[in-house]
Regions:
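Extended catalytic cores of very large enzyme megasubunits
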Residues: 1-255
């Protein structure tokens, strides 16, 4: 069902507001979740549609609505809110709901300067396509809203001046795994990459912040904490201060 209201899509084009399309997105977010109502999310959103409203604004209102409904009696709204956020993220990163190939994502992000180009030197296209077959984008539905929000805000590679995000959580997990095991023997590394991807994307292990945020980027940060020693001289103290500043800028802890 559509009406005369015109909304603005992410690419800047305009289309008639389609209420059924919005309802379909909310229904998908609630699928399989006990104690969650798509109608209640929509009513609680109380969206006041107007000409020129963006699809991004509509989605953000729906996410807030689901998040506001989280309670001790209805905890599963945290998953509905996360799914709505994941939908928004996919639309921003892929331009549509369905994922692009892992190989194309890597090349795009190398061109943007946010992925380390050495990944294409360490792995063949065929190996990257094999890694792509291991990726399970549906695992994004296992996030709670708080968990996915933290990943989006802190760990996904992005342009923080424009808030443009360049990857999704599952691509992030696979890139981390592929980078960490890139120098392993070729006959073994695909096995280890897959196991590490499964362990992280299924939340069986936690990754230190510097590794999660920077290991796949040109920064190539592996260390979580750095011990900085200083002699009792002005030159050494000033040099230590400069080192601390550089490490802190790259998210390393200082000891």
């Amino acid at each position: 069902m559509s009406n005369g209201t015109m909304i603005i899509k992410r690419d800047g084009s305009k289309e008639h507001l389609n209420i059924d399309k919005i309802h379909k997105v909310v229904m998908h977010a609630c699928e399989g979740l006990a104690g969650v109502s798509a109608s209640l999310i929509e009513m609680n959103a109380n969206i006041q549609f107007y000409d020129g409203m963006s699809t991004q604004e509509i989605q953000e209102v729906l996410i807030r609505s689901a998040n506001d409904l989280i309670s001790l009696d209805a905890p599963n709204y945290q998953y509905a809110a996360a799914r709505l956020l994941a939908y928004t993220l996919n639309k921003q990163v892929f331009g549509e709901f369905n994922a692009i190939s892992f190989y194309d994502m890597i090349n795009k992000n190398i061109e943007r300067g946010v992925y380390d180009s050495s990944i294409l030197e360490m792995y063949t296209k065929e190996e990257i396509e094999t890694l792509d077959s291991y990726i399970r984008h549906k695992r994004d539905e296992n996030f709670t809203y708080a968990g996915l929000r933290q990943v989006v805000d802190k760990y996904l590679v992005q342009d923080r001046s424009s808030d443009e995000i360049f990857e999704t959580p599952q691509f992030m997990y696979m890139m981390i795994a592929a980078t960490l095991f890139a120098n392993y023997p070729k006959e073994d590394r695909m096995y280890y990459v897959r196991r590490y991807y499964d362990a992280t994307s299924l939340f069986k292990i936690n990754i230190p912040t510097p590794v999660m945020a920077g290991v796949r980027t040109p920064v190539r940060q592996f260390a979580s904490c750095v011990l900085v020693d200083s002699d009792d001289t002005l030159d050494s103290i000033f040099a230590s201060d400069m080192s601390i500043g550089r490490y802190t800028a790259q998210r390393a802890g200082i000891g």
